[in-house]
């Protein structure tokens, strides 16, 4: 049995709220987190430094990011893994230790802030862990879901990693990061922000975000919005743009990713509300369709691990030749 844990005394802000930015990688989670900062959401003073992969910044707290990556490791996953998570793993003693550590870190680092945020692209995939952590802190939780056309996600990923950037592989990563636990968000305030719409009209999207998350706007926030729209956002931050019609034309796009994204797009454009009954009924079907692929997803992880272990080997060269023709 895990050791009984007592959290340290902290200066908790009354009515403290947290906003988690979630969504598959390459969907604009970093830009959306910077938008939250413009609205006055505290991100902490230990942010991960920009890199060539993301020169404008990740806006990820290093302490919580480190815990999240250890959770991923305890679940037997890598960044590129697509295997579905066995629900029994959420109750493991190792995750209990990390739950305690995450609670202590949040109380120590963010307990004094009335409104703070955290972003890690795989948070939604590990939502049961974070729900457990936040329930212990008593901090109210809300979400921003980053959405982006799966064709653009693959194009962006391909620039960083051609193997993960294959449309078929990117779609699988997108699905396992978004579909399994998205229905749990129905119990929280949340808003979906579409990356293309944010780039086109940042003022409107930040106003949507503020309204949905009950963030009051004052003179400071409004200046933050202007700085975000006029100084932070740059045309070069978006290298591709696909329409919704393109989803039906692309022969390699996974139909499950197409269908799930279309629901997110409807939420992002306010065609439906977050309590839309048809959304949640259909999403349950999406979960079932994805669950049926569990054996194949485990095998994909095995094959990709073999390819990465044998870079330059015969099998790796064969795959490279096959996919370079597509």
Region spans (language model):
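PAPS-dependent sulfotransferases, especially Golgi type II membrane carbohydrate sulfotransferases
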Residues: 1-14, 211, 215-326
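PAPS-dependent sulfotransferase catalytic core
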Residues: 1-99, 309, 317
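Short secondary-structure boundary/hinge segments and terminal tails
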Residues: 53-56, 152, 203, 227-230
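PAPS-dependent sulfotransferase catalytic domain
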Residues: 103-220
